[in-house]
Amino acid sequence: MRIILLGAPGAGKGTQAKIIEQKYNIAHISTGDMIRETIKSGSALGQELKKVLDAGELVSDEFIIKIVKDRISKNDCNNGFLLDGVPRTIPQAQELDKLGVNIDYIVEVDVADNLLIERITGRRIHPASGRTYHTKFNPPKVADKDDVTGEPLITRTDDNEDTVKQRLSVYHAQTAKLIDFYRNFSSTNTKIPKYIKINGDQAVEKVSQDIFDQLNKR
């Protein structure tokens, strides 16, 4: 099973991706995670990527396809995989097709923009462990302190409201074209994937069940 998981920043893609990964025993390929690891390394490329993300822009197609191509060649992708954060543009989708990457499902987790802004700007993170909190939906016991260590929580530099709005604008402009691309997609070497739209403004468990119900139909 090969799935592309779509969803605006804050839609809960990462959470659903982990659940799908465990249920179907497929590899979760998150370009966001790979990019953050590169930034954390402090390399020249990492510094360049940080500037791009801080400005609310998208990472180049060339870089994204390069890291995805390398990742899907690993043995844990033999049973299938879930692409989280790619493709985001038509050129990326076309490059995946050229690589012979056949997609079975396009799953979009849909959430209204005002809710996404609230979700993202309220996020707080413990850098060392990756534990995530939210000022409204999942607050720490002590404000801005990690529950386990008591260490300070941080806000990602790209989680401010202006940057989030810019990211959402870019997402909607590009994803609409991407969905049309896959809906009209035809190739002698590739079957047309099934497009599934899921209401993401529900409890995590309900979103997961809606996804499973659709995936199990085929």
From Swiss-Prot:
Residue sites binding AMP per the record: T31, R36, E57, L58, V59, Q92, R156, R167
Enzyme Commission code: 2.7.4.3
GO cellular component term, pick one: cytoplasm
Catalytic activity: AMP + ATP = 2 ADP
Residues binding ATP: G10, A11, G12, K13, G14, T15, R123, T132, Y133, Q202
GO aspect biological process, one term: AMP salvage
Keywords, alphabetical: ATP-binding, Cytoplasm, Kinase, Nucleotide biosynthesis, Nucleotide-binding, Transferase
A GO MF term: adenylate kinase activity
Domain-level remarks: Consists of three domains, a large central CORE domain and two small peripheral domains, NMPbind and LID, which undergo movements during catalysis. The LID domain closes over the site of phosphoryl transfer upon ATP binding. Assembling and dissambling the active center during each catalytic cycle provides an effective means to prevent ATP hydrolysis.
Protein's name according to its UniProt entry: Adenylate kinase
Protein's organism: Francisella tularensis subsp. tularensis (strain SCHU S4 / Schu 4)
